[in-house]
């Protein structure tokens, strides 16, 4: 079918579809889901099981190992990592990156079945294993509800719950999570002396309250035709009921609990998590939106709702925006419109300057139709607007006009030779239609590995491929339909009598090309030398994995030595908070203690329930000040907190590992692992640029152990469990049961009234009771007390113990270069015993996995490109000539990065992939034209020079518009390096296409001037 001819004959049909593209594009932009970043599925689940009283070794052997063994038999399991603490097992299951999203819910169901299977094999006293598969939920709209000292935690909690209840009703809201709520408890304070005087054992209180407060089934009774449920109601309704509970002493006397104990409300101490916002106690409120919704619109509705609710809040309570994804997405879309307008203006202006005003309007209109059609099709494919898809439009901007440029240039050249306008526009589009399609497909195929690569990092940029594929295919269709239609009434070119190429510019180019062809071997050798030189320079250039984003935020993880409690963490973070709030550039400071906050940013790391951990989120007034303030904060902490480990960072789009550089040593013996890790740490200490050097297991923690004696214990009638219960009552409180108040459950804790005054010395004299009510001290039931230092955690990787030597790069130090220096030194310094191995983790692991994922589909891409070339050119030599041009783009890549000062990173690699397609696309246009002229009977040398001369404008315009269209992205923190890569590479590729490719072609075909 002759599409150009059909477009002119059926103009009304084409006009209709063009109107649909514009209207659909406008509607698509208004209704497409908008988010800050592309959504990618975090294919991991977290398993948690508590085993109170067990050491990390016991937790590992009795809880972690059985669960891991069962889970490992699951389908598509990629990694299993675990951490065994005192009384707690944490296991993370990561699925194969290639797992389709549709299979994940089924796999998590299978995981739960595996957990149910292993539960009966866990030791008595182990809790039920909880499975959290919503690990990757993002609460991108994040607030902090803070109060001054005049409010209780209950009042703060009530208001937080009220806001949560209101927020879940907003259309588009999926979940609302609260963070930092304090757990209300009922404390029963007793004096051991009083209990001894009244002859009441702690076990009596435990048994009595546990039996009285439990809900039991009392059965049912048939009465005539009615089945009557029998209900027993003896649970505590008020604290007075609890205080009135009767206890029977060893002598048989009865006493009220309130007579021998103090019953009062309180909060769990120490708390598991805490939060502060701008120096005030707070509760975090994270809002997660549904997939595909317009977060800008949903966020506006949330802000409107909260504005009305905050007006009802009491004085002294404040709601602070901590991270507004809706505002960030709105700004990104506004920036996109500006960048898009700039790119369109640049592209059209260049075309107008070179090809004329009418040609500029003609080609520029095809650009708008391509963008509108892409937005329309994105709706049907379920794609949304985000940082990656918007960048895809900017990247595609220059390439979208390539096909229209070729068609328009062909038509103009034909009209210059006297052809009728209708004939010129039809033949100008019809003649190169297959070569343009092939070149378009090649450009799309070059980005194909991004879409197919099975890795979370590659998944981030998949929308970029979708945008490019849709828009480029549309541009080809429009070049055969809209361009001839518009060109038939817009193009006006006066025929010229002579050769249109007989100008000063073309004559100068002919002389240059003749010289290049005459010195062909020298040209080839020079270009080869430049290629080798560029590879050498590339090896010396700084490289990075993912760039930092230009947000007015930075965050910091704070870690104290293992063994510190959350109150120690609080004291340190309060001082840091005071310093940060005193900085004039700082707008808001929020802190979480005990764990990271809800995942408000997709690429955030998650750390749960560590009392020695804190996280700080700092917002600044101006994003240009972020790096300077972060650097000052690092210096302040380093100078004033010698025991604190701090890792602050700007925001990145990749998941953040525990450390940038990690060498993991795998084996069985803890002492051997620690020795191997210590050697690697010594290397890090000696290497300039390495900071935050640490052991992944942390420091050994102090342990105090009463050595229970069965002989002594049996003689006085005190069991090991009774001794342990007595210590628990004196140190943290023993759980008696739950007090229910509405929908709230409060633990009832039995505590020694002197709970805060015990130390390791007077604990030895702690009174304990035997069954007859007699009182003894702990030391009477033990063979002494042992004080030791042991690992506070045992970490495993795929069911093997792993200990990591970790570090981060210092300020201004390149991660890749530091890793390369460390890797060589560690390999030399660490001798691995038999049965032990070393594995690289950290950013290098992520980068290697991402690169391997991309490389997995590179052969497919090359095969597809080769097939297209063979179909177009129908021989072998011409495809080889074209493919030989690909490695030479490295010359331009190095030039672009060096001139702009950018670092080669993951997005530069994406740009490199795109360059392959762009370069081949330009080369195809030239090589096919050479073949056409040779087939028409022209002398090979004349065909070579004439084809090159005729393709200068289309090739230069296609490359020039792409290069200049990249300008708005050059200053983007995320895609700047990719823009520099494409701009530099394409500039050199253009020169190669019009200067070097003819030389290589002449060498392959032995073409010489007659």
Give the ranges of each region predicted by the language model.
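Hydrophobic regular secondary-structure detector
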Residues: 1-110, 114-115, 272-624, 632, ...
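A structural signal for conserved, well-ordered secondary-structure elements
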Residues: 4-7, 12, 30, 34, ...
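Alpha-helix initiation/capping motif
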Residues: 152, 386, 503, 622, ...
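Extracytoplasmic/periplasmic membrane-proximal domains and adjacent transmembrane bundles
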Residues: 6, 48, 119, 166-345, ...
